[in-house]
């Protein structure tokens, strides 16, 4: 593994699926597009630290086999392999973020740093670090490897968050922060990742919460006319939960 001060850390970023393989699908939304967007953002954050060289398994919407993904990482002698995915389940209530890794010390340690940063940045349900030897890209790469499941495309609230460009920034920034923390690299991204977004107008609010907030404004439960709000993401979630509760049945 690269040593700090000797050379740059070489990180292979693997956006899951692509091309003829869309991955998990919910309506018009496909996993392959989310993974590529987040992967590119992750590369931007890591490269901004001047400590990392990035190797991609794909940078566009093309199909890359699992074997080729591993070969790219192995032939480039990468120090770590980070695979980005979006989860799916038959139960639409399933939600949250998890990080998977092979039974290997460095992989487990990196996974813990990444998972901690992701939950801290997003407030998502913590599904934890999971050990598995069933994923080809984890057991066929010759370096420590982790796979991030950054939310459930099958869960409406997770999906609405994943659609939001700022939320994708938080996911990518948190993964970058976890990697930097693992390598004990001080990073400017920590401020970016933890800085909460404030929604000032109805138009800025993600679709999953827009109707609930509008109703609250119309009834006077929220002061303002929809053009002078100051709502955090946590507030949006509470508003949606409250709206569903009072309107259930």
What is the meaning of each model-derived region?
Residues 13, 184, 246-248:
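Short, flexible coil/linker elements and helix-boundary hinge sites characteristic
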Residues 3-11, 20, 29, 33-193:
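Active-site-proximal helix/loop segments of hydrolytic enzymes
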């Amino acid at each position: 593994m690269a040593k700090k001060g000797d050379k740059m850390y070489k990180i292979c970023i693997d956006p899951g699926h692509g091309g003829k393989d869309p991955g998990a699908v919910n309506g018009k939304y496909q996993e392959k597009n989310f993974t590529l967007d987040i992967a590119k953002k992750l590369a931007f954050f890591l490269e901004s630290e001047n400590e990392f060289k990035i190797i991609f398994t794909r940078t566009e919407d093309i199909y890359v086999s699992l074997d080729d993904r591993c070969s790219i990482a192995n032939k480039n002698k990468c120090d770590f392999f980070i695979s980005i995915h979006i989860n799916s389940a038959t139960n639409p209530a399933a939600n949250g973020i998890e990080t998977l890794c092979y039974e290997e010390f460095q992989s487990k340690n990196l996974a813990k740093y990444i998972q901690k940063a992701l939950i801290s940045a997003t407030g998502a349900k913590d599904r934890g670090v999971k050990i598995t030897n069933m994923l080809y890209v984890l057991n066929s790469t010759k370096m420590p490897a982790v796979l991030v499941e950054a939310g459930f495309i099958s869960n409406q609230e997770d999906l609405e968050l994943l659609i939001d460009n700022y939320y994708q920034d938080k996911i990518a920034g948190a993964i970058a922060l976890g990697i930097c923390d693992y390598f004990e690299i001080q990073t400017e991204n920590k401020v970016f990742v933890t800085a909460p977004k404030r929604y000032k107008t109805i138009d800025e609010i993600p679709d999953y919460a827009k109707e609930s907030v509008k109703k609250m404004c119309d009834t006077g439960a929220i002061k303002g006319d929809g053009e002078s709000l100051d709502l955090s993401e946590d507030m949006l979630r509470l508003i949606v939960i409250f709206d569903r509760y009072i309107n259930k049945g």
